[in-house]
């Protein structure tokens, strides 16, 4: 995998990374001039760990215009986000190979939430639940952070402000996943196959998704040719029929379902 950027309205994507290791985008910097991404590429001679690229990934930063990536931290992590001030990273750790989508388990590899002060390089573990704590995102204004936890039995959203926690969702049947937050404090997440948005102190609502095409390939759509035939002719042996549909010539068997 490599990192690309493109306008939300569609258009040509710009490739930012070219390394043979998988590069996974995480966040934009507050000034929108750089992208944070995780990669298992070598971090330099100070890192003496010999690890699998599937497990520990380092956090890098690269300009949205391209260029050489810059290493930010060698700590193995995932789901990394940067705050509005650009001086703190919040992330979930990655202790082992346990499936990210496994539910209702407690073990030595369940994920926890950490913060990294980019000025002091200090790491602080925030979560204490023995099960899964996942996908942290900063609340706008640096007042707190949201994250997913299974402490209620199923993954739900919690708001943490200075150690005081407030439950935001209360689902029981299925887990909440893919959490993000906008600058106006509107949450976005998936639940039971649908995409939801939830403004602060309001109810969640499912939304319709329209995906923009990047314009590199023609759009494809499966169409039936059993109707709309304009001309046809029977073959001399009576076994095939040639016909025209939407300006294209097709041949179909009289007995059978094969059409070319």
Locations of the language-model features?
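Conserved beta-strand position repeated across blades of beta-propeller domains
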Residues: 27, 81-83, 137, 179-180, ...
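Residue-level detector of Asp-centered blade-edge/turn motifs that repeat once per structural unit
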Residues: 30-31, 84-85, 140-141, 182-184, ...
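A flexible loop/linker signature enriched in serine peptidases of the S9 family
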Residues: 1-4, 17-24, 33-60, 64, ...
